[in-house]
Amino acid sequence: MPNIPAHIIQARQEVGQKIAAEKLPSWAACPTIQYPARLSMEQCSSEWTARYKSQLIKGETLVDLTGGLGVDCCFLSESFTHTTYVEQQPELCQLATHNFASLGKHIHVVNAQCEDYLENMQPADVIFIDPARRDNKGGKVVLLADCTPNLLDIGNKLLQKCQTMY
């Protein structure tokens, strides 16, 4: 990853590997997986949760509008023919691109704001969206209007673009 000092990358790998050993065992078993900053590791779904979600929905096309580290998207993609991962943070997109390839997944990665991508996207069978539940100071939020993206603001557009929202 460009512009990140090697010692920071090494520290992230060590911390990420420890967290993944418990939370994402199949990722931990893949020696080429690259890990993000600790907060992204702590906030991502566990492998077991992501596998459970993947049993609940299936279809032709899936769009994950809040990709994050890509754990949910990775496992959900097993139930879809075409999967698109959308994430606003460039570094997470770089990691997802690398990690999906390392895991043999064919997932289209898009670096964009959820709202911008949603505006112009083709309809999908399923839209997966897991909004951030922290404010800009890192505090937890509980109201839908305080999540990012604000589901109340984009709810109608989401319903126009998919058969199922999860």
Regions found by a protein language model. Give the residues of each.
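SAM-dependent transferase fold signal centered on methyltransferase-like domains
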Residues: M1-Y166
